[in-house]
Amino acid sequence: MATHILFETATGFNIFQLSGMESIAEFTDQVQKSMQDFSKFSKVCKMVGSLPFTSAENALENINSISEGILTESLHDFLKQTFSKKTEGVVLGVCDNKLSASIGDELKISCLSNSHTSEIIRCIRNHISEFTKLKSADLLKAQLGLGHSYSRSKVKFNVHKVDNMIIQSICLLEQLDKDLNTFFMRLREWYSWHFPELLKIIESQVHFAKLAKLIQNKKNLTEESLDEIKEILEDNESLAKDVLSAAKASMGGDISQIDLVTVMHFADRVISLDEYRTNLTQYLAKKMQDIAPNLSALVGDRIGAKLISRAGSLTSLAKYPASTVQILGAEKALFRAMKVRGKTPKYGIIFNASAVSSETKNKGRIARCLSNKISIATRIDCFSDNPTAKFGVALKQQVADRIKFFNNGVAPKRNLDVMKEVIEEVEKDFAEEEVKPVVKESSSKKRKESEPTEEKSSKKSKKEEKSSKKSKSDDVEMKEEPVKEEKKSSKKSSSKKEEEPVKEEKKSSSKKEDKKEKKESKKDEKEEKKSSKKDKKEKK
């Protein structure tokens, strides 16, 4: 019986403590009704700890780990802190079995995950807004945001990498081939009752159906329809004339109008199905170029699509070893041989590849080499960010070189050297693709810059004209100004010359006066000294 419950929400982790488990364990109708009342349920279940998520990224990281049964560091520390005092007697109820096992292994806490625990968690979920004191609208927003980000991380895929379209297309194409073959045979037998010679002249099934639709009743066929017959037979005039002559001398019986209409309806349906098959073939080729260009270049669109369909997906095919790819499609023969202890098959679907089917000798060795190259090509297609068919072309050339080696003994290039050359070519191509848009942008910028420069030049020319007019008027003014300045300067110079001698005269007169004053002061001092000496003598 669980004593505590670990509950995860979009906002964080919560731990609840349970009490009175005897009544809850019964889960009668009365107990279930009381569980719906929060006041009663809160007496039995109390929240003892909570760990809110710090951000949306933190919430997504924790939820991703919990969904895989991994114990995160934050949850580890939270549980350790909550049950730090006592772990004995604690039984933690956890919703996920894997998570409960990882908690028990790391923290040595006994965990429980059963129907009783899930019922209690359901009741907690019903009252979580009251426990956390959060509004139900806020909880719903958090759940929506986390749910969208979680699903986005799980359902992350590239639209061009949808190999399911290839699987469905090749299955439908194979079925169409079988059905169309049956329908063409039925049309031949049906229309041959009326015109049996046409079956011997025309070998192509599509041409036979189109001619049957054109001719209808052989009695109405004339030479006027020769051009139309030539158009159907791709401008083969001799065959067209043979059809005309055979219609005139035909041994077939007459056919009623009702029977002829029925045959023509069936011919229309067969022709439309053949057109749909050609469109589907083109669609498959385009999809193979988008999803597995190297595999398509190595073995062709249809064989590559068959391999992907047999493996289940491109990723599954990329994970297969070369030995499994070699016998893919020959599982029945393989298990039959293993049961009887006979020889195992050397090839499966890849037998239809031109490299294997065209050779009479060394088919097993060529199939082994081709399966090795297929496994390399599928891994490049599956895990490369920039799809390119150059690796597939190089691998196909390696298979051709290996066939030459088996037949003539000419040593092929090393795989390492070939791959280095291809990688250099691919890097050059991507560098050129990155440079092209930059060149376009710079040219557009130059064009934009050139347009305003032309406007600026026109504006400048207008300004220069105005400035030239102004400069002429300024020159006239400048010529007049120096004359005025010369007159002013002459007046100033004459006044200065007159002022200078006056200043010199004043200076000389002031010097003379100073000398006279000094002489007088010296005389006065001498007289005072003499008078002072006389006074001293008289006192004595």
Swiss-Prot record:
GO BP annotations, alphabetical order: ribosomal small subunit biogenesis; rRNA processing
Comp. bias regions, Basic and acidic residues: 434-488, 495-530
Secretion signal, residue range per the UniProt entry: none
Keyword Repeat recorded: no
GO cellular component: box C/D methylation guide snoRNP complex; nucleolus; small-subunit processome; sno(s)RNA-containing ribonucleoprotein complex
Ranges annotated as biased composition (Basic residues): 531-540
Region (Disordered): 434-540
Ranges of residues in domain Nop: 291-408
Gene Ontology MF terms in the entry: snoRNA binding
Keywords tagged on the record: Nucleus, Ribosome biogenesis
SUPFAM superfamilies, A to Z: Nop domain
Disulfide bridge partners, by residue number: none
Compartments (UniProt record): Nucleus, Nucleolus
InterPro entries registered for this protein in UniProt: Nop56/Nop58, NOP58/56_N, Nop_C, Nop_dom, Nop_dom_sf, NOSIC
Keyword Nucleus: yes
Highest taxon, organism lineage: Eukaryota
Protein family according to the UniProt entry: Belongs to the NOP5/NOP56 family.
Functional summary from the UniProt entry: Probably involved in the early to middle stages of 60S ribosomal subunit biogenesis. As a component of box C/D small nucleolar ribonucleoprotein (snoRNP) complexes could function in methylation of ribosomal RNAs (rRNAs).
Protein name per Swiss-Prot or TrEMBL: Nucleolar protein 56
Organism: Dictyostelium discoideum
